[in-house]
Amino acid sequence: MNNLQTQFPHIAIKLNEPLSKYTYTKTGGEADVFVMPKTIEEAQEVVAYCHQNKIPLTILGNGSNLIIKDGGIRGVILHLDLLQTIERNNTQIIAMSGAKLIDTAKFALDESLSGLEFACGIPGSIGGALHMNAGAYGGEISDVLEAATVLTQTGELKKLKRSELKAAYRFSTIAEKNYIVLDATFSLALEEKNLIQAKMDELTAAREAKQPLEYPSCGSVFKRPPGHFAGKLIQDSGLQGHIIGGAQVSLKHAGFIVNIGGATATDYMNLIAYVQKTVREKFDVELETEVKIIGEDK
């Protein structure tokens, strides 16, 4: 597997790369092989090679809603951060997989295009956002998603239309079929820039007031259980401020777990499990994780 550097001398490849550099929690073990394609063609080459040689392949976006275990990830990590182009086509925006959702929302603002205001504070990449149908404050990616270019796990390039991109709460066809997002097309609407800015300012203020942005975190840890709010259940269970190792249930918003210093992925997972157990015993409600947990135990 280490011969990928010989096989693809034109592609940036690192061995035994610490993944804590790429996650918002600042935790995670090492990647055996860490690949950073600069073009869609390079990404396609690597995906096809991994499929042909039965090498495990993991896609890494912005690392924002993700916990990578302390034992790291075997096989190849494909990091799409260098695919960041954002372009306008009439009232549509085409953003590549590695583009930040926040930057895409800002681009829409600069172009006086409305529809992505809800995304102005979501820290993920376009690829990750499509994968989990990211959303906030009443908006979801699927509301404005028109089309996507993806790679299958065999390296086949596919164009998906809106009708093929089924989505629900924190779910998408892309996740179901394990597609690799290369770009996304969003259909937006012309609007006065000052009105778009006002909406973004309102949402940013709400986010800053409620969320613990001063600490590393993976964002909202749990999905919203039917008929409940995860943060309220955790708070009413007396868990706000609870600490395991360097991980803490946020004092600002109980739906977040923050790294208050030196946390490991194991600390995060132990605290998540403790929260789930406590809420289950107290309220008979099962908290399902929204954050994605991947990798191997140490």
Curated annotation (Swiss-Prot):
One GO process term, biological-process aspect: regulation of cell shape
Location of the protein in the cell: Cytoplasm
Domain called FAD-binding PCMH-type: residue spans: 27-191
InterPro entries: FAD-bd_PCMH, FAD-bd_PCMH-like_sf, FAD-bd_PCMH_sub1, FAD-bd_PCMH_sub2, MurB, MurB_C, MurB_C_sf, Oxid_FAD_bind_N
Chemical reaction(s) catalysed: UDP-N-acetyl-alpha-D-muramate + NADP(+) = UDP-N-acetyl-3-O-(1-carboxyvinyl)-alpha-D-glucosamine + NADPH + H(+)
EC number(s) stated in the UniProt entry for this protein: 1.3.1.98
Keywords noted in UniProt: Cell cycle, Cell division, Cell shape, Cell wall biogenesis/degradation, Cytoplasm, FAD, Flavoprotein, NADP, Oxidoreductase, Peptidoglycan synthesis
Cofactor(s) the record lists: FAD
Pfam families per UniProt: FAD_binding_4, MurB_C
Molecular function GO labels: FAD binding; UDP-N-acetylmuramate dehydrogenase activity
Domain of life: Bacteria
GO cellular component: cytosol
Pathway, per record: Cell wall biogenesis; peptidoglycan biosynthesis
Keyword hit for Nucleotide-binding: no
PANTHER family: UDP-N-ACETYLENOLPYRUVOYLGLUCOSAMINE REDUCTASE (PTHR21071:SF4)
Full protein name: UDP-N-acetylenolpyruvoylglucosamine reductase
Species name: Listeria monocytogenes serotype 4a (strain HCC23)
